[in-house]
């Protein structure tokens, strides 16, 4: 697995799936999530206001991106309550993103760290990388089918 950090405009980044964290109780969007929502025609706000996705820990929802961007799929990951959020929550969210990418048989995944801007950038990036690597690890030594899962994780 290759894990790398890049600083790029989200909508111009070519990726099979971009994972974005959403806190529970989110009613307004900011940062990249607001920009992505505008590109998707407001679907993220509609999903949040309808209650179909609440941002609770463990929740996930895949949306499909517009044709004119490099964003093929958008994965909303529920982060739970902001006051209970810590580095372990980042690990779990990144791990869930990797498992969804593997379930969809995607070869790579990008994880946006924009939702974590109130936290230390270095420790957040490290926790996301740890969660992704731990979720992707599988014991394959004694297995005859050594197929690989998600092999490339990019954090934005």
Give, region by region, the residue ranges found by the protein language model.
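Short amphipathic alpha-helical segment within the helicase RecA-like ATPase core
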Residues: 1-156
């Amino acid at each position: 697995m290759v894990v790398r950090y890049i600083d790029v405009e989200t909508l111009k980044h070519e990726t099979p799936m971009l994972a974005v964290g959403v806190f529970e109780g989110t009613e307004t969007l900011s940062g990249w999530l607001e920009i992505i929502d505008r590109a998707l025609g407001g679907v993220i706000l509609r999903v949040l206001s309808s209650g179909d996705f609440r941002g609770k820990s463990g929740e996930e929802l895949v949306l499909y991106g517009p044709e004119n961007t490099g964003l093929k799929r958008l994965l909303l990951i529920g982060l739970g309550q902001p006051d209970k959020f810590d580095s372990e929550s980042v690990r779990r969210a990144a791990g869930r993103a990797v498992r969804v990418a593997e379930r969809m048989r995607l070869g790579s995944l990008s994880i946006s760290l924009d939702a974590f801007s109130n936290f230390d950038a270095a420790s957040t990036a490290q926790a996301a990388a740890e969660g992704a690597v731990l979720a992707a690890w599988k014991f394959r030594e004694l297995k005859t089918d050594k197929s690989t899962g998600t092999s490339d994780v990019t954090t934005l």
